[in-house]
Swiss-Prot record:
Family: Belongs to the iron/manganese superoxide dismutase family.
Highest taxon of source: Bacteria
Induction: Transcription increases slightly by internally generated superoxide stress.
Gene Ontology MF terms in the entry: metal ion binding; superoxide dismutase activity
Mutagenesis / variant outcome for changing V43I: In strain: S087
Official protein name in the record: Superoxide dismutase [Mn/Fe]
PANTHER family: 37S RIBOSOMAL PROTEIN S26, MITOCHONDRIAL, SMALL RIBOSOMAL SUBUNIT PROTEIN MS42
Transmembrane segments annotated in the record for this chain: none
Further comment: The levels of SOD activity and sodA expression were growth-phase dependent, occurring most during stationary phase. Expression is not affected by manganese. Is not essential for aerobic growth in complex medium.
Length: 199
């Protein structure tokens, strides 16, 4: 069965003024859609068509070598963006077990946000910043391009796209401003759900 572009759980303008409508329309309808189209082309006629995107990306080493790069880039792009849309909400509220765990590990939510922001800003070129569960503990990691932490056995529960296509229309070269705005639209309820499933 072909992979499909998921619908957004909110309107394209729902995250204004933090993430603008035009960026959301292009990011979802063009960028993410292209990953889905290219992923489907890469896996057509292989047994990967019957697997979940999580299973494929977690086991990239088992993907045939001739399509491995295409699947890594486009499968990762599809998985990362599908999760990213769910991690955003116009009704952000900082609460849940995961917020308590963050405070326990970092001392405060602000200290966590600062480290996350620093690592996201320092990610050279295109990539992602993540909060992951690794052996029961929380870790902040970054990945290049469309790589996902599940390839390394870590479970992502919060992710931020720091490719320029995610912010350039509104923030231009000011990635730190985009990262700062991100905290206003984090879906902590979803982060908490993922944390409780992974711990």
């Amino acid at each position: 069965m072909a992979f499909e572009l998921p619908n957004l759980p909110y309107g394209f303008d729902a995250l204004e003024p933090h993430i603008d409508q035009q960026t959301m329309e292009i990011h979802h309808g063009k960028h993410h859609n292209t990953y889905v189209t290219k992923l489907n082309a890469a896996v057509e006629g292989t047994d990967l068509e019957s697997k979940s995107i999580e299973e494929i990306v977690a086991n990239l080493d088992s993907v045939p070598e001739n399509i491995q790069t295409a699947v890594r880039n486009n499968g990762g792009g599809h998985l990362n963006h599908s999760l990213f849309w769910e991690l955003l909400t116009p009704n952000s509220e900082e609460k849940g077990t995961v917020v308590d765990k963050i405070k326990e590990q970092w001392g405060s939510l602000d200290a966590f946000k600062e480290e996350f922001a620093d690592k996201a800003a320092a990610r050279f070129g295109s990539g992602w910043a993540w909060l992951v569960v690794n052996n029961g503990n929380l870790e902040i990691v970054t990945t290049p391009n469309q790589d996902n932490p599940i390839t390394e056995g870590k479970t992502p529960i919060l992710g931020l796209d720091v490719w320029e296509h995610a912010y350039y229309l509104k923030y231009q070269n000011k990635r730190p401003d985009y990262i700062s705005a991100f905290w206003n639209v984090v879906n902590w309820e979803k982060v908490d759900e993922l944390y409780n499933a992974a711990k």
